[in-house]
Curated annotation (Swiss-Prot):
Function: Part of the ABC transporter complex MetNIQ involved in methionine import. Responsible for energy coupling to the transport system.
Cellular-component GO terms for this entry: plasma membrane
Protein name, entry field: Methionine import ATP-binding protein MetN
Subcellular location as annotated: Cell membrane
PROSITE patterns according to UniProt: ABC_TRANSPORTER_1 (PS00211), ABC_TRANSPORTER_2 (PS50893), METN (PS51264)
Source domain of life: Bacteria
SMART domains: AAA (SM00382), NIL (SM00930)
Membrane topology label: Peripheral membrane protein
């Protein structure tokens, strides 16, 4: 597919307290039309700065930006992109934030309508005109239905929950029919249940409207829920980017692995083993194995195969299967018991089958 967002070799620098700070360094990111693209990193990684260059809320120092085939910034060959042209361009990019930024003295309906006060459309002769009052009202009514707030249109922000406030913000961000929706930590202020509801809404809007979503977050669980692609940022640089499935199946960078571990129940289980009395120390002919597998591998009886082929026995302590982008991913923690030669043959079989595994070793009980 064609990239709707192209950020090429972008750097962003600014002066802070007498010193030059590089917030983004030589970052390249291409986002295709229809992606839900997660950009993840810890606080200060540069993810918000990078993504705010998409609509030029943050002007880069170096590099090139192409949005929907139109070059809007090029440090090597400056582009004149200001005034009315810039305002019109920004209307096609909606944004939501961690803080909802609603007008407290206006109702839900009027908070959304406020974003339409300068909106224009083309008439049948190709001339631009402002929306009529009826057109604005119809648009707001349609959007409130879309975000499931039709029955709260007369309420004020103080009467809403956090999730409802964010739904108002989303409706407001959609008023000018944007092709791109940026969520800058849009779920960070919400509890887990409400977070999932907002993520479900974003996914639904993506499907209904065909909108491209850019999701900035410090939580891998948020990315895991709805994104199809991921970029990981650290110290202003994109250190890894790939499809969600490939990131989870074969993470390359230590930071990426750390983020993935925060979403994995198998890692919590492994950590708990050192504090449990369920397992004594392993025998000399036993090893504890953590095995990951995905897709068609889940259909194959791998554990059964190794017990038959290599004269080893197994004892499964943990098993889990979940779906990522509709593809199953599974984890097992099991003991492998047998002679060193037979255990080595079983592990070689894992390698042959392209299964990801690690030897966890013996369990040593620890005390808190």
């Amino acid at each position: 597919m064609t990239a709707i967002i192209e950020l090429n070799n972008l750097s962003v620098q600014f002066h802070q307290k007498g010193r030059l700070v590089t917030a983004v360094k030589n970052a390249t990111l291409h986002i295709e039309k229809g992606d839900i693209y997660g950009v993840i990193g810890y606080s200060g990684a540069g993810k918000s700065t990078l993504v705010r260059t998409i609509n030029l809320l943050q002007k880069p120092t170096e590099g090139q930006i192409v949005i929907n085939g139109e070059k809007i910034f090029d440090s090597a060959n400056p582009v004149k992109f200001t005034g009315a042209k810039l305002r019109e361009f920004r209307q096609k990019i909606g944004m939501i934030f961690q803080h909802f930024n609603l007008l407290s003295e206006k109702t839900v309906f009027n908070n959304v309508a406020f974003a339409l006060q300068h909106s224009q459309i083309e008439d049948k002769n190709g001339k631009k005109r402002y929306l009529t009052k009826k057109e604005k009202n119809d648009k707001v009514t349609e959007l409130l239905k879309l975000v499931d707030l039709a029955d709260l249109s007369d309420k004020y922000p103080a009467q809403l929950s956090g999730g409802q406030k964010q739904r108002v913000a989303i409706a407001r961000a959609l008023t000018n029919d944007p092709e791109i929706l940026i969520s800058d930590e849009g779920t960070s202020a919400l509890d887990p249940k409400t977070t999932n509801q907002i993520l479900d809404l974003l996914k639904s809007l993506h499907e209904k409207l065909g909108i491209t979503v850019v999701l900035i977050t410090h939580e891998m669980q948020v990315v895991k829920e709805i994104a199809n692609k991921v970029a990981v940022m650290q110290n202003g640089e994109i250190i890894e980017q790939n499809s969600l499935i490939d990131i989870f199946a074969q993470p390359k960078e230590a930071l990426t692995k750390q983020f993935i571990e925060t979403t994995s129940s198998v890692n919590r289980f492994i950590a708990s083993l050192s504090k449990t009395e369920l397992l004594a120390q392993l025998a000399d002919d036993e090893e504890l194995i953590h095995l990951d597998y995905s897709g068609s591998e889940l259909e194959d009886p791998v554990v059964s195969d190794i017990t038959k082929k290599f004269d080893v026995t197994t004892n499964i302590f943990y098993g889990n299967v979940e779906l990522l982008q509709g593809q199953p991913f599974g984890s097992l923690v099991l003991t492998l018991k047998g002679s060193s030669e037979h255990r080595a043959a079983a592990k070689a079989y894992f390698v042959e089958r392209h299964l990801k595994f690690e030897v966890l070793g013996k369990i040593e009980r620890t005390v808190d």
